[in-house]
Design a protein with these regions (language model features):
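Predominantly a Rossmann-like dinucleotide-binding segment in NAD(P)-dependent oxidoreductases
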Residues: 114-266, 400
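Rossmann-fold dehydrogenase core element
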Residues: 96-113, 133-140
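Short, Asp-centered acidic motifs that coordinate Mg2+ and/or phosphate
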Residues: 15, 56-57, 137
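N-terminal Rossmann-like dinucleotide-binding module
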Residues: 1-36
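Glycine-rich beta-alpha junction loops
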Residues: 20, 141-146, 194-199, 287-289, ...
Length: 419
């Protein structure tokens, strides 16, 4: 919302809802001061959605397990939606929302921010130019980052796949979506392997307290020490997403909060975390394009290699730091390498590689100027397919099967498979 207020001629906030009052007030305070008194605040989504339609577009940014109900009610009230990913906690509900949006003629944009980044748009332009020739295969990697993984997918909201969604959906639906977008064709088959190997009690070589605040050794001696939230600014910034008032809190107040919160736990003794800390998937797309995707807690940043009949493309943080450039194209026979220029993030705002700014700046066009929902940048119709891919990868990981995407979707819709 803060970014949307950079476009006052396009956007106006009329209401906000959150069970934590200060968060709703923060949304209100993003608006120009002269408009704040007219903005209505509600205690929760139910209260807001019990009102007649208040605006053109509703933004739903609740936790993963509470997307479906408010999204469904908002669509039925006549709202177009900007919906945080994943679309819903289950694939069946995801497909139900897709079908409901089509039935009601409503526009639903999904926050797949990678589609809006200068980085991935530059890659897509290279592919569409034909410079690589026909695409044959790709390797894509997402390094979640060690502290990020421990914060979000062990201690945090997404540590348990039943309470949230499977890792490939909760985190990597961004990747499934961007690969679908880059390949520009449907995925037909997937297989996958992945395990929770490291963040479990068996990793410990000797007993220790389950809460880091009960440890007596020097802070930071163990790299996973939650007390680093107090002493290390690079760790503390993650608390801004889960602890209200952290910017004004004293070290003593943060320590007290850690004593009872999920984020004070030892990452090896959380007990309820079940997300794989490493995962690989093999994907086959229409026309025979194949690719691999790797998710790991033990690297940071995304990188990708795409191999065509004329040339190969290499891109990502690894190549920016260790090679000739963030994106390069190398011809197979001449060995000539071209560095692809990547635009700076618009407006100087680099959140999600500039994708946050891109999403907001395109929202008005997508909701009001695009001739049809399918011409939006992230329509639910396209995003739903990437969710099918992600849930199919999870099914393949659990069962060891090679999963046919169309058949998997049919079995989920029929109730034969519970996803």
């Amino acid at each position: 919302m803060k970014l949307a207020m950079e476009y006052p001629e396009r956007f106006r906030i009329v209401a906000a809802a959150d069970p934590v009052t200060v968060r709703a007030e923060q949304v209100r305070d993003f608006a120009p001061e002269a408009e704040r008194s007219s903005i209505r605040l509600f205690a929760n989504a139910d209260e807001l959605l019990s009102q007649p339609k208040l605006a053109d577009v509703a933004i739903i940014g609740t936790q993963d397990d509470y997307h479906f109900e408010p999204a469904k009610r908002a669509l039925e009230l006549g709202y177009d939606l900007l919906l945080e990913k994943p679309i819903s906690k289950t694939l069946k509900e995801t497909l139900e929302l897709r079908d409901l949006a089509e039935k009601l003629g409503r526009r639903v944009a999904i926050c797949h921010v990678l589609r809006y980044t200068p980085f991935y748009n530059a890659i897509r332009n290279v592919i569409r130019s034909g410079e690589l020739g026909e695409i044959m295969t790709f390797n894509a990697n997402e390094g979640v980052g060690a502290w990020h993984f421990g914060h979000s997918f062990v201690r945090g909201h997404w540590g348990n796949s039943v309470k949230s969604t499977p890792m490939i959906v909760a985190k990597c639906c961004h990747d499934m979506d961007i690969l679908y977008w880059l390949m520009d064709r449907s995925c037909e088959q997937v297989s996958s392997f992945g395990e929770l190997s490291f963040f479990r009690k068996e990793t410990l070589t000797e007993p220790r307290p389950e809460r880091c605040t009960d440890w007596t050794g020097p802070i930071g001696e163990d790299p996973w020490d939650a007390r680093k939230y107090v002493t290390d600014e690079s760790c503390r910034r993650w608390l801004k997403m889960v602890m209200d008032g952290v910017d004004e809190a004293t070290p003593e107040q943060i320590t007290e909060w850690l004593k009872t919160s999920a984020w004070g736990r030892d990452v090896f003794q959380c007990g309820d975390n079940d997300q794989p800390d490493h995962l690989v998937a093999i994907l086959r797309y229409m026309g025979g394009i194949t690719g691999t995707f790797t998710m790991t807690a033990f690297e940071e940043g995304r990188h990708i290699e795409i191999y065509g009949t004329k040339a190969k493309l290499r891109a990502g943080a690894f190549y920016k730091e260790n090679g000739p450039g963030e994106i390069t194209v190398t011809e197979h026979f001449s060995k000539k390498t071209r560095k692809v220029e990547v635009e700076e993030a618009s407006g100087g705002y680099a959140g999600h590689g500039g994708g946050d700014w891109g999403l907001v700046s395109n929202l008005y066009h997508d909701m009001r100027e695009a001739e049809s929902p399918m011409l939006m940048t992230t329509p639910i119709q396209a995003s739903a397919h990437s969710h099918v891919i992600a849930f199919a990868v999870e099914h393949a990981r659990r069962t060891g099967e090679v999963v046919d995407i169309a058949e998997f979707e049919r079995r989920v819709l029929s109730g034969e498979l519970k996803y």
